[in-house]
């Protein structure tokens, strides 16, 4: 079953949001109590990359660039992920040669190209397995609100355009827990998007004493894009961001098709997309994350004129990742010495 985030989450509070407020109060109370629990501790530095809201914010590319930076510092990072949509049970180490998105989830498969990834609903058990494999740094992909593993540092990612939506807690809005609870337990915020669009994010950070950092997504295409016209399709948290990124590198998006996040395309879906593109003489464009799900069903063989887009990040502070990792390790050492 695929569920897309409702549009009213990302607008000013509506009548529907008002009607759902009683349910939000109950959910928010439970979420706050859950975040107050004492999590299990592992003898490794732990950096959590999370977000305030349900839906895509850009966590996966952040974890990837942090993995790359950690390796340049001589570390062996391991990534803990729940593995949304996985079918494998227990703790599982992702193997890019043998696993596919259907079995382990699309995001873990992307992450496994850059670091060892353990998926499990039990994040502590996954971290233990990574430690057994020789990892000396844990990067936790999501899990900030669940408190299933002690974290030395929590970096929360915000999409500059969407921000916190209407500012309400689920189901009246996109917040995973009351904002004041999340702000009190996180360490810093990374706003992803154009700098001008990040301005409104300053408002809810001001006065917290927490730092705010900036980055923007830089698209990487599998083929030349400039001057080509596209039918772009995606089943990710925020497909509009992907469509806009094609225009940023001089591609022309003529038509778009959006699907729910983590959606597994069918033969009929791709047949329809190919027909639309052929009629209009367009190239097809999709994300690397979507492509892992297409490959999982071996549907990529018959697709012609398809360009796959990956992303990296450009940080306002060039040394952001290295400084962050050094802070995480320093906090871990302080925690260890205080025992």
UniProtKB/Swiss-Prot annotation:
Pathway named in the protein's UniProt entry: Glycolipid biosynthesis; lipid IV(A) biosynthesis; lipid IV(A) from (3R)-3-hydroxytetradecanoyl-[acyl-carrier-protein] and UDP-N-acetyl-alpha-D-glucosamine: step 6/6
First-tier enzyme category under EC: transferase
Annotated positions binding ATP: 53-60
GO BP annotations listed: lipid A biosynthetic process; lipopolysaccharide core region biosynthetic process
InterPro entries: LpxK (IPR003758), P-loop_NTPase (IPR027417)
Enzyme Commission number(s): 2.7.1.130
Gene Ontology MF term list: ATP binding; tetraacyldisaccharide 4'-kinase activity
Disulfide bonds: none
Catalyzed reactions: a lipid A disaccharide + ATP = a lipid IVA + ADP + H(+)
GO CC terms of this entry: plasma membrane
Source taxon at top rank: Bacteria
Keywords carried by this UniProt record: ATP-binding, Kinase, Lipid A biosynthesis, Lipid biosynthesis, Lipid metabolism, Nucleotide-binding, Transferase
Membrane-spanning ranges: none
Pfam families linked to this entry: LpxK
Stored HAMAP family: LpxK (MF_00409)
The protein's role, per its UniProt record: Transfers the gamma-phosphate of ATP to the 4'-position of a tetraacyldisaccharide 1-phosphate intermediate (termed DS-1-P) to form tetraacyldisaccharide 1,4'-bis-phosphate (lipid IVA).
Family classification: Belongs to the LpxK family.
Protein name listed in UniProt: Tetraacyldisaccharide 4'-kinase
Taxonomic path: Bacteria, Pseudomonadati, Pseudomonadota, Alphaproteobacteria, Hyphomicrobiales
């Amino acid at each position: 079953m695929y569920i897309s985030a409702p549009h009213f989450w990302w607008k000013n509070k509506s009548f529907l949001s008002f009607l759902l407020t009683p349910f939000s109060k109950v959910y928010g109370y439970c979420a706050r109590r859950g975040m107050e629990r004492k999590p299990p501790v592992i003898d490794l530095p732990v950096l959590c990359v999370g977000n305030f809201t349900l839906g895509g914010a850009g966590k996966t590319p952040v974890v990837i660039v942090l993995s790359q930076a950690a390796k340049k510092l001589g570390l062996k990072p391991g990534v803990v992920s729940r593995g949304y949509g996985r079918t494998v049970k227990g703790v599982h180490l992702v193997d890019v040669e043998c696993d596919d998105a259907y079995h382990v989830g699309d995001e873990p498969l992307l992450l496994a190209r850059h670091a060892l990834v353990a998926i499990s609903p039990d994040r502590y058990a996954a971290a233990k397995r990574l430690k057994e494999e020789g990892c000396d740094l844990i990067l936790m992909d999501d899990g900030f609100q669940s408190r299933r593993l002690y974290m030395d540092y929590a970096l929360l990612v915000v999409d500059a355009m969407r921000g916190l939506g209407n500012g309400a807690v689920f189901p009246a809005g996109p917040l995973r827990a009351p904002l004041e609870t999340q702000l009190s337990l996180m360490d810093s915020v990374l706003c992803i998007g154009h700098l001008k669009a990040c301005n409104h994010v300053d408002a809810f950070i001001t006065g917290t004493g927490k730092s705010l950092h900036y980055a923007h997504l830089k698209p990487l295409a599998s083929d030349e894009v400039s001057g080509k016209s596209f039918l772009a399709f995606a089943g990710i948290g925020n497909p509009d961001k992907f469509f806009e990124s094609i225009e940023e590198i001089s591609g022309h998006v003529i038509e778009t098709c959006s699907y729910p996040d983590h959606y597994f395309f069918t033969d009929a879906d791709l047949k329809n997309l190919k027909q639309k593109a052929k009629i209009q003489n367009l190239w097809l464009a999709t994300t690397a994350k979507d492509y892992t799900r297409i490959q999982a069903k071996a549907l990529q063989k018959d697709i012609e004129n398809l360009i796959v887009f990956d992303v990296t990040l450009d940080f306002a502070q060039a040394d952001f990742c290295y400084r962050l990792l050094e802070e995480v390790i320093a906090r871990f050492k302080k925690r260890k010495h205080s025992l």
